[in-house]
Amino acid sequence: TLEHEYKVIQDLGKLFQVEDKADSIVTSIRKRLTDLQEQASREKDKPSVMIVQYMSNKLVNWGDDYLQADMVKKLGGRLLLHTKGYITEEEILKQKPDVIFLMVTEWDYDKKENLRSQLLHTPSLNSLPCIQKERVYILPLYEGQYSGVRTAEGLEHVAKGLYPDIR
């Protein structure tokens, strides 16, 4: 959760005797979250969301217990599935997400656009509005899970995916 990230940053600040810097980083992230939440609150539509990742060429759904899910929920998105596990294309079709965030790990950063394209061009998913409107957004693991000082960047990416006009 975001609270966990704040604690990690502050704990590291204590460990390295830079508590003021850590507090400043946490304050900055909290301020950015508040700003994004204020903008999101003015949006009429609260998009439904799935967070997925390719693992061994199969899709895995990320559940509630992860930072990126907390980001989605704190910004007004509606997470459709709440447990982590492999998911079929049929299950994605049933959920009809407005937005899909595609988690990409460090060993896949160089092919992130190919992975996004693979999802966008999966024939069985082409009836989904999020596929037709290309509302599939890459979320690097370093921004959406154990993000630490990059938490604000992760929040911004999630906010832009949920509400494209947000600043």
Tell me the role of every PLM-derived stretch:
Residues 48-53, 79-81, 100-103, 135-139:
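Structural recognition of the beta-strand scaffold that forms the well-ordered cores
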Residues 73-90:
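Interaction modules related to DNA damage response and DNA replication/repair
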Residues 88-105:
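Proline-aspartate-enriched helix->loop->beta-strand connector
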Residues 31, 86-91, 119-126:
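Alpha-helical scaffolding within the catalytic cores
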Residues 21-75:
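Basic- and aromatic-lined ligand-binding clefts that recognize polyanionic substrates
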